[in-house]
């Protein structure tokens, strides 16, 4: 018997955030694709260089490593993401991993600072 789309959607709806991250990574590997949103290329206007010179407004905070203070980094990740202990631990152990995506510059820098104060290393993308 084939699995229906509704069954798949129901199973996905019941997954935790970390399970979804693992599912996406497995699908990327299996099918050789990325989960990045497709962006349509717009024709360049007369001031095309001006758009390239605009400052980035959204940042992704990526945990590079947790160093030798894993417990402190897990606490910092829980504080900034609101994840449960298990999910935060899985996120930290899967480094490099995104902690926060689409954050403002100030928010991203604050999250990076908290992770680094806890003993981990993070970068902004």
UniProtKB/Swiss-Prot annotation:
GO biological process annotations for this chain's record?
translation
The record, for Gene3D superfamilies, names: 3.30.1390.10, Single helix bin
Query: Which keywords does this Swiss-Prot/TrEMBL entry list?
Result: Ribonucleoprotein, Ribosomal protein
A GO molecular-function annotation? structural constituent of ribosome
State the residue spans of region: Disordered.
96-125
The record ties this protein, via CDD domains, to: Ribosomal_L7_L12
For bias kind Basic and acidic residues, which ranges apply?
A: 102-117
The record describes the protein's role as: Forms part of the ribosomal stalk which helps the ribosome interact with GTP-bound translation factors. Is thus essential for accurate translation.
In Swiss-Prot or TrEMBL terms, this protein is called Large ribosomal subunit protein bL12
